[in-house]
Amino acid sequence: MGPGIQPTSARPCSRTKHSRFALLAAALTARRVKQFTKQFRSRRMAEDILKLWQRQYHLPREDSDKRTLRERVHLYRPPRSDLGGIAVAVTVIALWATLFVYGLWFVKLPWALKVGETATSWATIAAVFFSLEFLYTGLFITTHDAMHGTIALRNRRLNDFLGQLAISLYAWFDYSVLHRKHWEHHNHTGEPRVDPDFHRGNPNLAVWFAQFMVSYMTLSQFLKIAVWSNLLLLAGAPLANQLLFMTAAPILSAFRLFYYGTYVPHHPEKGHTGAMPWQVSRTSSASRLQSFLTCYHFDLHWEHHRWPYAPWWELPKCRQIARGAALAPGPLPVPAAAAATAATAAAAAAATGSPAPASRAGSASSASAAASGFGSGHSGSVAAQPLSSLPLLSEGVKGLVEGAMELVAGGSSSGGGGEGGKPGAGEHGLLQRQRQLAPVGVMA
């Protein structure tokens, strides 16, 4: 064989080369088709989940007709399975039960020792108390998620059972009462005398907190607590331990929930007496860990109102989505008097050629834009009002003490204030479908 001639088996075969390219192209095409199919199924499944949610619950009034279902799903996709919600709820309840038993029967308080007993160290007592208080908060958050159907959306009875169980262990609240009032809060957020969680004309911390707590208490709740306490006494749980771990801890937890979940996000600015819809509620920019330790991400309150079908552990994800979509809380609307004053000042400034002073009235147009442009996806121009860092709890305690002094002095009257609407005015969804929305399968 001559020096420039290759054997037949060593010559490149154009047919083989083309077949390899064809196989590679087919593999890439199949992969793309598989990815597209997976994405389509995922989106379709998310749409089905949201449709199921909407048949049982209600989207916020401002969001009902502004976006299509596909657009809402594109922003946030609910969990595909109930397993995550059930696992989180059961874990919180189990951790609380373990620490509750330890605190009631194994912690020896120095002021309630029996003969021959050794007191538990103060460090251990403090660790148990604050850990249990945090888990009490988790119990309420679990109930809150149950009221939104985010524990077990596909099994309403199990969902409501876990919510009822958690709130019974918390403080024997009536789950059906909480369920009804919480959805009134979502459907009438910030409407004076209509929103059960909004202040009654006096936004003082102590006054608001007292009214908030009293509105959810019932006589049957106290009867259940009395029976439960006596059963624990018969089981050997000292009364002193009950007062510390079963009374003080949930009260502190209730204040934490109110402060970060109601007072901070829905507190009106000074001089504002009208409605405060959820679009202008404040939210937190704290880190994921800080937000969790604060109140199980309850400080991400704007995101919760925007996507009420998102479980608490996915609220940080909702915040990322909101930032990516240029969605943000809007500014409060300006009272008419303040707007007129600002307009006069602006006119005077224009006449003299001097720059107008900075004023909240300058954001009045953006406030109306927030109401009109939010649903249509143009809220990126709305000035955001996130909290760079939530106020310290000590500030809240200080305000609570000041408010208590005001109550003692007779300053708790909240006669006027606020533009009260008629109860039921602007009713939407929930109150018209009470039978469909009422919790089912709950404990008696």
UniProtKB/Swiss-Prot annotation:
Region named Disordered: 408-444
Family matches, as PANTHER family: DELTA(5) FATTY ACID DESATURASE C-RELATED, FATTY ACID DESATURASE 2
ATP-binding among keywords: no
Keywords: Carotenoid biosynthesis, Oxidoreductase
One Pfam family hit: FA_desaturase
Involved pathway(s): Carotenoid biosynthesis; astaxanthin biosynthesis
Cross-referenced InterPro entries: FA_desaturase_dom, Fatty_acid_desaturase
Residue spans of biased composition, Gly residues class: 412-427
Enzyme Commission identifier(s): 1.14.99.64, 1.14.99.63
Enzyme class: oxidoreductase
Keyword set includes Oxidoreductase: yes
Protein name in the entry: Zeaxanthin 4-ketolase
GO molecular function: oxidoreductase activity, acting on paired donors, with incorporation or reduction of molecular oxygen
Highest taxon listed in the record's lineage: Eukaryota
GO biological process, one term: carotenoid biosynthetic process
Gene: BKT
Organism: Chlamydomonas reinhardtii (Chlamydomonas smithii)
Catalysed reactions listed for this entry: all-trans-adonixanthin + 2 AH2 + 2 O2 = all-trans-(3S,3'S)-astaxanthin + 2 A + 3 H2O; all-trans-zeaxanthin + 2 AH2 + 2 O2 = all-trans-adonixanthin + 2 A + 3 H2O; echinenone + 2 AH2 + 2 O2 = canthaxanthin + 2 A + 3 H2O; all-trans-beta-carotene + 2 AH2 + 2 O2 = echinenone + 2 A + 3 H2O
Functional summary from the UniProt entry: Involved in the biosynthesis of ketocarotenoids which are powerful anti-oxidative molecules. Catalyzes the conversion of zeaxanthin to astaxanthin via adonixanthin. Catalyzes the conversion of beta-carotene to canthaxanthin via echinenone.
